[in-house]
Swiss-Prot record:
Keywords: Protein biosynthesis, Transferase. Its EC number is 2.1.2.9. PROSITE patterns: GART. (6S)-5,6,7,8-tetrahydrofolate binds at S112, I113, L114, P115. This is Methionyl-tRNA formyltransferase. Belongs to the Fmt family. It comes from Haemophilus influenzae (strain PittGG). The keyword Cytoplasm does not apply. The lineage of its organism: Bacteria, Pseudomonadati, Pseudomonadota, Gammaproteobacteria, Pasteurellales.
Length: 318
């Protein structure tokens, strides 16, 4: 088994976990590419990405170009003479000159079973859509978005209580071992490249804060999936009014679907220790864990202890 000289390109914690797995393997990371430092926190101080922090701890050269389209950046990368480039949630488009620079091309770790969800948010969209199974795909990159030949797929179930946080952690563990397996066998015939069927693909669009607002004209089953898909970001929310008529926005962390009641969508049906029940166009959404502004997430019962007037039975929420 040959040790490979690898360029690693990635930015968030999900990527850093893959970098650590390669560092723990027999392969050599000769350079790391990551997004430029970005302002973060209240002081808006420049903050290095998790991948950069890990690279610096291991004395690996770090490159942070704003783009890889310029010839200078491409020449710099090519001069590294890498065997392969591993790309995990990097955040920059790789032009053909970069894809062709490493001897064995560029590999990408994708957080779903392709071609089902191509794009930026495959983990979240798989929950949002009600998929019961997902996984990770290691693919050979080409010039289009998530369309390259698939080398290795590893499957896992999506549990009925799965959030994007829990699924992300599960997939990270699967993906790191799958990646090392591919790298260890890249120059033998263990993994045969498989073409994608583009007709089976969907675009996993980025989540937005606007989309996280609970829309009572949607079925309760869809809203419950949204709550899990949008955790840890942007967190599903809705608004009600206090006794003075002031709008109060609440984030929702946990809910369950109950049988349909014949009331207009958005009607508060009950509010007690068992939850806050809201009628939807199809089914009832029972809110179990919520977070008012400036407070920590709490049970519906704890929320009602001081704010019962926010949830008058029969009130119709917008």
């Amino acid at each position: 088994m040959k040790s490979l000289n690898i360029i690693f390109a990635g930015t968030p914690d999900f990527a850093a976990q893959h970098l650590q797995a390669i560092l723990n393997s027999q392969h050599n990371v000769i350079a790391v590419y990551t997004q430029p430092d970005k302002p973060a926190g209240r002081g808006k101080k420049l903050q290095a990405s998790p991948v950069k922090q890990l690279a610096e701890q291991n004395n690996i050269p770090v490159y942070q170009p704003k783009s890889l389209r310029k010839e200078e950046a491409q020449s710099e990368l090519k001069a590294l003479n890498a065997d392969v480039m591993v790309v995990v949630a990097y955040g920059l488009i790789l032009p053909k000159a970069v894809l062709d620079a490493p001897r064995l091309g560029c590999l990408n770790v994708h957080g779903s079973i392709l071609p089902r969800w191509r794009g930026a948010a495959p983990i979240q969209r798989s929950i949002w859509a009600g998929d019961v199974q997902t996984g990770v795909t290691i693919m050979q990159m080409d010039e289009s978005l998530d369309t390259g030949d698939m080398l290795h797929k590893v499957y896992c179930d999506i549990l009925p209580t799965e959030t994007s946080t829990s699924l992300y952690n599960k997939l990270a563990e699967l993906a790191t071992s799958a990646l090392i397996d591919v790298l260890d066998n890249l120059e033998n015939s263990k993994f045969i490249a498989e073409k994608q069927d583009g007709s089976q693909s969907n675009y996993a669009e980025k989540l937005s804060k606007e989309e996280a607002q609970l829309d009572w004209s949607l079925p309760a089953m869809q809203l419950e999936r949204n709550i899990r898909a949008f955790n840890p970001w942007p967190i599903a929310y809705f608004s009600t009014e206090d006794k003075d008529g002031n709008a109060q926005t609440l984030k929702v962390y946990q809910a369950e679907v109950l049988p349909h009641q014949d009331k207009p969508a958005g009607t508060i049906l009950s509010a007690d220790k068992n939850g806050i029940q809201i009628a939807t166009v199809d089914g009832v959404l029972n809110l179990l864990q919520l977070q008012p502004a400036g407070k920590k997430p709490m049970s519906a019962q704890d929320l009602l202890n001081g704010r019962a007037e926010w949830f008058t039975i029969g009130k119709v929420l917008a």
